[in-house]
């Protein structure tokens, strides 16, 4: 993961280390600072693919900073993915991020046209915060740099949003979605979803320079990721925390890992180890309050801090081991619960923040987007993944949040959606004869 800070608010050089503390952890390879047209552009680089390329990108008085990974850029024309962004803006205009395939947060200043573009991908997998006060802009990967600069009112850019403003007057010119989904439920097989998922794993793992790791439970989501990586003959390492897992399923998956030649660590997360993992969070992760709620009840978890989530401690533990083992690319299963099951099945909630008990209606327009598509547990657990993995200098990638994977699920008929818990993944695991525990929701 990379990170950035942009502002035209003045600060002292000796304040920079405090301002950049949490964000610098995400990009430990190179920190670059440039002053352009009265603005400070700071970028922290985590180099994962392509040549080591510092930012910002500049061309014809247009300046761009970027955090994430693009999977469809012209590798013959550009030595890194971010170098393609200004050319795409010049070709397609302020809504150019609609043409991107990847996970990203982008800020682009066109000083010629007085235009500022802020955009994340459809699910805001990479965070982006901004503030506009007294004629000054503050834009950053995290909230804390803006607060350290003295900004009082900081806003997280909404998921699936392109925000176009005037640089000088701060006037909002336009907001548009990055991805628009078709809610017609017309496909009566899982074939196209399976193909999209296979392609999503491939684009996030093939031809990478750094090593890959996953957290492997006995559940559906990590099982599907593991299965596809094994099918692709990918080199990767799996870390499993035993305890609440289905040990029979986990043992079978461990056997498949062994015969593939990939490493699989079975771990006991003892209280002393939990304390160490939690202390890392306290020291290196900024505060983030969860936004989890249900649209069908008054249940919420607004009181819960990312720092106190048990899953945060588990991810911190696994991330510490991945960093020790020099594995930098984390393939996350985030999003499957929110999109393919709504934390329930057949109208019965598995967790109280479920919105409709996983019973998909004949007309998706009546519920889409339900809160956990873009907000609620999606926003909260993505923050957990990004903040924790980022604090160890690791990059998280999200195959279940690929727009094609999501669209193919939405296109399946209600009968297919409701045929089994997490129907698309259930079918995938069955077709591949991969060990699974039917209808179990497993994880930290």
Description of each model-found segment:
Residues 1-279:
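Cysteine-centered catalytic environments shared across enzyme families
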Residues 271, 438-444:
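Short linear loop/turn motifs
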Residues 32-33, 267, 418, 437-439:
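Short, hydrophobic secondary-structure boundary micro-motifs
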Residues 8-12, 114-117, 127, 181-433:
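ATP-dependent adenylate-handling active sites, centered on carboxylate activation for C-N bond formation
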Residues 55-57, 100, 340-343, 394, ...:
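Short clusters of hydrophobic/aromatic residues that line enzyme substrate/ligand-binding pockets
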């Amino acid at each position: 993961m990379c990170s950035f800070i942009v502002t035209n608010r003045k600060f002292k050089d000796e304040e920079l280390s405090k301002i950049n503390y949490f964000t610098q952890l995400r990009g430990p390879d190179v920190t670059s600072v440039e002053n352009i047209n009265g603005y400070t552009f700071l970028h922290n680089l985590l180099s994962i693919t392509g040549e080591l390329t510092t930012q910002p990108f500049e061309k014809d008085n247009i300046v761009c900073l970027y955090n994430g990974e693009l999977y469809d850029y012209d590798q013959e024309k550009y030595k890194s993915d971010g170098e393609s962004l200004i050319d795409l803006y010049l070709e397609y205009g302020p809504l150019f991020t609609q043409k991107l395939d990847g996970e990203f947060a982008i800020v682009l200043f066109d000083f010629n046209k007085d235009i500022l573009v802020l955009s994340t991908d459809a699910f805001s997998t990479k965070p982006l915060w901004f503030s506009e006060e007294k004629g000054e802009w503050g834009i950053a990967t995290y909230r804390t740099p803006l607060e350290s600069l003295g900004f009082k009112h900081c806003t997280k850019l909404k998921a699936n949003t392109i925000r176009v403003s005037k640089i000088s007057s701060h006037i909002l010119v336009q907001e548009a979605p990055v991805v628009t989904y078709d809610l017609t439920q017309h496909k009566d097989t899982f074939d196209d979803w399976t193909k999209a998922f296979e392609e999503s794993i491939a684009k996030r793992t093939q031809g990478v320079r750094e090593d890959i790791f996953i957290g492997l439970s006995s559940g559906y989501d990590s099982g599907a990721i593991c299965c596809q990586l094994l099918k692709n003959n990918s080199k990767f390492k799996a870390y499993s925390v035993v305890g609440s897992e289905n040990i029979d399923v986990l043992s079978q998956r461990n056997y498949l890992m062994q015969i593939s030649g990939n490493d699989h660590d079975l771990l006991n997360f003892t209280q002393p180890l939990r304390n160490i993992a939690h202390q890392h969070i306290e020291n290196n992760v900024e505060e983030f309050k969860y936004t989890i709620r249900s649209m069908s009840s008054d249940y919420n978890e607004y009181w819960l801090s990312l720092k106190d989530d048990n899953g945060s401690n588990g991810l911190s533990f696994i991330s510490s081991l991945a960093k020790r083992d020099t594995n930098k690319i984390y393939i996350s299963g985030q999003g499957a619960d929110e999109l393919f099951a709504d934390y329930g099945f057949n109208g019965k909630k598995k967790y109280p923040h479920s919105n409709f008990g996983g019973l998909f209606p004949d007309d998706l327009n009546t519920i889409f987007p339900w809160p956990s598509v873009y907000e609620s547990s999606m926003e909260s657990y993505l923050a957990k993944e990004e903040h924790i993995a980022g604090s160890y200098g690791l990059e998280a990638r999200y195959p279940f949040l690929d727009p094609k994977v999501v669209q193919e699920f939405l296109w399946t008929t209600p009968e297919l959606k409701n045929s089994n818990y997490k129907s698309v993944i259930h079918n995938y695991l069955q077709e591949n004869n991969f060990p699974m525990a039917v209808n179990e929701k497993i994880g930290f």
